[in-house]
């Protein structure tokens, strides 16, 4: 890669700055990263993209822990959630340690997809990946759990020495008062107080 030495230098400096100012750096690779896919070329491309994220974090000298998380949705259900989650766990083993040590998974915003409960029993119990609780997504894919129950289940998957990460957003439809906007779309601003239920997150 052209200018790789200069790139490494800037990334290393950025990593030092993040630690100096106590900034927690994380990433959220795009939705095309689908480790549940039954198509080998999709999985290969996913592994390549996630590896790039892990390499960048390594060049920044960030911790190989979920403190510096690389967070993804696990991908499609393909009509069989259980088989898809099993595939995800198998394909997880294709990832380098720079990714496996940082990878987290997040609950989805469609009822047909993955709730915190799905991820807990189908992924976390198999391979120990922490779950990032998304408050807004939970409204559309609750897994028959209350917000507090799902939050606390997700929190329980994190190492005890790392503050769990969560995602919080609100509905753009409500913010813009526009019924044509997908209710799952994120608002530009936060208006309500975030209920942590007494947890440090």
Which residues does each PLM region occupy?
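Active-site proximal loops enriched in glycine and acidic residues that flank catalytic Cys/His/Asp
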Residues: 107, 133-135, 168-170
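Active-site acidic/histidine proton-transfer and metal-coordination neighborhood
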Residues: 3-130
